[in-house]
Amino acid sequence: MTIDFLGSVSGSGDAISCRADGLIYAGIEWQPEGDPVVIAIHGWLDNALSFDQIAPGLSPCRVISLDLSGHGLSSWRSPDSTYNLWDDIPQLVAVVDQISSGPIIIMGHSRGAAIATILASILGDRCTHLVLIDGLINAFNDDKNTVDQLSRFVADRQKYLAREARFFDSLDDFVMRRRAFGFDDSSALKLASRALEQSSAGFRLRTDPRLHGASALWLSEAQRDEVYAGVTAPVLGICATEGLLTRSGVPEKMLTEAGRHFRQFDCIHHAGNHHLHMDPTHTASLADNIKTFLT
């Protein structure tokens, strides 16, 4: 499938699609005959094309990047369902089973890094390596604010279920909006073919509006630590020098906690912003660092 005005929805890879629990998980595959298998999980409001720049550099690995539910070309979750951090996990396990019966490597960016960590903990020894690009599990549930959090979740759910589809008059309008989320123009355009659909009314955003809503609950700090401890694979944490962890103001504490609870945690600081894996200035070096970790 190709949208001429936006370019290929598969970038430099090949389109794939899996079905789990009635949901379609669309994705992109690079080096289909390669080995080992890398499952790549994108960040919040991104899509599978976010790995298009770095995936070829990970050869000879077979790299499969999936649109999470509500993103890109994948299905939206039903109105009675949610987009909490763990909600994709059962379907991702089913998709992994369809892709490979053997060991896999899991790689995630930002929110996708948190999801990748939970997935790796559940898959146990089947996950041989975990790569986290500028992301950790970094939001905790405060027991004193549980009712407030649930109230926000219910209010946001009603708000975004009622929201009409969003349209952009031009690609420039879409790019301007993405800048607010820390994207440079080229990275925003890279995502456009899976993020947008052309219609007579303009460029319709494919993303489920409910992804903007508050989560029902977050993991507690103790639960986060247990998830970390459950990952049997060695973990590579990649912190962008101008990235989210740096901007959060608590990167050292987060990294210290990760190092304390992961069984094996190596951390590197790499030049670039939060989306460094999409920046051609940095992807060759980043891919080399990842391949060194995998060997």
Predicted regions and their residues:
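Active-site loop/oxyanion-hole signature of alpha/beta-hydrolase fold enzymes
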Residues: 23, 68-107
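Alpha/beta-hydrolase fold catalytic core
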Residues: 1-38, 59-62, 100-103, 137, ...
